[in-house]
Design a protein with these regions (language model features):
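Metal-dependent nuclease catalytic cores that hydrolyze phosphodiester bonds in DNA/RNA
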Residues: 1-91, 95, 199-209
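Short amphipathic alpha-helical surface micro-motifs
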Residues: 3-6, 41-46, 61, 110-111, ...
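A diffuse structural propensity rather than consistent per-protein peaks
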Residues: 4-7, 102, 143, 164
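Mg2+/Mn2+-dependent nuclease catalytic core
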Residues: 55-156
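Non-catalytic, well-ordered alpha-helical scaffold segments
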Residues: 8-9, 76, 106-110, 173-177
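Metal-dependent nuclease catalytic regions and adjoining charged, substrate-binding loops involved
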Residues: 68-69, 118-209
Length: 209
């Protein structure tokens, strides 16, 4: 059987909502909304660029990545290769929105760094996320905390994928508002069903007592 490589983009789905991850990567459901369509257009624009070299830095676009160790694979938007010795590899990811408190985008960047380290036999100490909406570039240290968080997510997401299990909706209802899978997921109906069965179980317990 072929080894399954988890798409790096799936880690962001998992970090946002494990159910969203499972709907896309276990059940193969996908529904595009304004946010996903806009994000796709942005990546197509970034992907168009040819490699170029300026002031000791080579800029490589749409670089394919793979880690045999962590069983992840994907494509990164931009890799800066600083050509002085020792060479420095600096991943850059483009996002349509603005910087976030949560690590969703940083996890994706860290997974890219893990692949580069394995493929190039190097250590990646930092990368950057460029936010289209705010025209801001956030430098991200690839530190021990981010690495641990990213590796935890890789392992848990991989297990869910292997088990074919779809978790319940996130407790954080605000995330559902911008979720491209809201119509397919029907989180409110699922939550109501869960509340109904919970109440039934509660009264069943009282009858027994
Ligand atoms: S609608 Fe909410 S619970 Fe469902 S996948 Fe999206 S974020 Fe998760």
């Amino acid at each position: 059987m072929d080894t399954y490589f988890l798409p790096i983009s799936a880690l962001q789905h998992y970090a946002y909502c494990p159910r969203q991850f499972a709907l896309i990567h276990v059940e193969q459901a996908w529904e595009e909304n304004y946010f996903t369509a806009d994000g796709r257009r942005l990546h197509e624009r970034v992907d168009d660029g040819e490699p170029e070299q300026r002031k000791g830095i080579r800029y490589e676009r749409s670089v394919l990545l793979r880690s045999e160790k962590h069983l992840i694979a994907g494509k990164m938007d931009l890799l800066e290769v600083h050509l002085e010795e020792p060479r420095k590899y600096f991943p850059v990811e483009y996002k349509r929105g603005k910087p976030k408190i949560e690590d969703w985008d940083r996890i994706q960047l860290c997974a890219q760094a893990l692949c580069i380290e394995e493929m190039q036999g190097t250590t990646v100490t930092e990368g950057a996320i460029w936010y289209w909406e705010t025209r801001q570039r956030e430098t991200v240290p690839i530190d021990a905390n981010l690495r641990t968080h990213t590796l935890d997510i890789i392992q848990t997401a991989y297990k869910i994928r292997q088990a074919g299990h779809t978790p319940p909706p996130t407790e954080n209802k605000r995330r559902c508002r911008a979720c491209s899978l809201k119509n397919l997921c029907q989180p409110d109906i699922y939550r109501q069903d869960r509340s109904a069965s919970y109440i039934e179980e509660l009264f069943a317990d009282e009858k027994i007592a």
